[in-house]
């Protein structure tokens, strides 16, 4: 029997609230030739019992428990490290896979070139009131050169190719290891690793909505908004990234300057979300932390971001209250 070519890596810490649903969706896949590696980060709720039950019933479930509490990012890296396959698909304990998620993923792997290191997919969103965004029809694969993706990301103050989240990401494990895994300095450790991967390799986007992202207040994104960490992380990361990969990417002086403006676009998007959620006090506190030179350009950028956000959420508002859209 040949070894699987792909594993699912699932990190968890006290995930008893949603874990069983996630495991059920993974193990019910139409494509079954994979292993599921779960890294339990010293959970002290019902998580260990749930995992033991599933491991006893399905040999594909491999559980490894950390004896000591480690950081979230360390546990992400630990989960990936448990996999021994060429490709790894990430999964969060609170999200769901469509029944043909792995089938679509493996079909993409079968046709991509050796230059491809990262595969992303589209997703639906599930809110606390039970509303799930409508499904759309699947469309063909889109393959992009990594350098093209980065340059488009750096243009237009961040309006560019969509990069995957944790649950929508599949990657070559060898490249993940070569890059040193996720960096726990950053709240957007996933996006920043993808950018580093794509400085070396190419990217494929699956427009099929084969995962469901559950929106709730315990997410990393919610933490990033609450502290406005996104802005300051981008401000620190971009110069470091340009210094490391700028020459390899052939970035012109103009492109380097645009890259350094990216945190402005991120800040505008963050503030637009906070304003839409009615968190004015948080925005005012955040503005005091920004460089003075940012304040004037932030006005039109934030206004533009608010217009875009309102358009994006127009279909959601009749179904989901703002406090659930922005937990």
Regions inferred by a protein language model and the residue ranges of each:
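A conserved acidic beta->alpha catalytic loop
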Residues: 40-49, 68, 92
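Conserved donor NDP-sugar-binding/catalytic core segment of glycosyltransferases
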Residues: 100-136
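Short, well-formed alpha-helical segments that are part of the catalytic scaffolds
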Residues: 14-28
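Short loop->beta transition adjacent to catalytic acidic/histidine clusters or analogous donor-positioning motifs
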Residues: 3-7, 27-38, 46, 59-62
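Glycine-rich, basic loop-to-helix element that forms the pyrophosphate-binding segment
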Residues: 66-83, 96
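Conserved nucleotide-sugar donor-binding catalytic segment
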Residues: 8, 81, 98, 121, ...
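Short aromatic/hydrophobic "clamp" motif used to bind/position activated sugar donors
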Residues: 88
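C-terminal subregions of glycosyltransferases and related glycan-biosynthesis enzymes
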Residues: 154-159, 187, 192, 199, ...
């Amino acid at each position: 029997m040949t070894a699987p070519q792909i594993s699912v890596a699932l990190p968890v810490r006290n995930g008893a609230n949603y874990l069983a649903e996630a495991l059920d969706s993974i193990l019910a896949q139409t494509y079954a030739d994979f292993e599921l590696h779960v890294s339990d980060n010293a959970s002290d709720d019902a998580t260990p019992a749930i995992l033991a039950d599933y491991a006893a019933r399905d040999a594909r479930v491999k559980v490894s428990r950390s004896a000591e509490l480690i950081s979230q990012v360390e546990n992400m890296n630990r989960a990936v490290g448990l996999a021994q396959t060429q490709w790894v698909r990430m999964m969060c304990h609170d999200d769901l896979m469509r029944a043909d998620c792995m089938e679509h993923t493996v079909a993409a792997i079968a046709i991509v070139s050796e230059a491809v290191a990262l595969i992303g997919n589209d997703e639906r969103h599930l809110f606390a009131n039970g509303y799930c965004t409508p499904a759309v029809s699947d469309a063909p694969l889109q393959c992009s050169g990594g350098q093209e993706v980065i340059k488009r990301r750096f243009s237009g103050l961040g309006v560019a190719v969509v990069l995957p989240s944790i649950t929508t990401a599949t990657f070559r494990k060898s490249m993940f290891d070569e890059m040193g895994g996720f960096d726990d300095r950053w709240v957007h450790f996933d996006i920043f690793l993808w950018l580093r991967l794509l400085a070396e390799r190419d990217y494929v986007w699956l427009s099929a909505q084969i995962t469901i992202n559950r929106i709730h207040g315990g997410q990393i994104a919610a933490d990033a908004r609450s502290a406005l960490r996104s802005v300051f992380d981008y401000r620190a990361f971009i110069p470091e990234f340009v210094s490391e990969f700028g020459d390899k990417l052939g970035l012109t002086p103009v492109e380097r300057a645009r890259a350094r403006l990216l945190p402005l676009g991120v800040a505008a998007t963050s503030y637009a979300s906070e304003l839409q959620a009615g968190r004015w006090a948080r925005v005012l506190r955040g503005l005091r932390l920004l460089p003075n030179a940012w304040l004037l350009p932030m006005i039109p950028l934030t206004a533009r971001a608010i217009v875009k956000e309102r358009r994006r959420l127009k279909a959601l508002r009749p179904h989901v209250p703002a406090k659930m859209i922005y937990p």
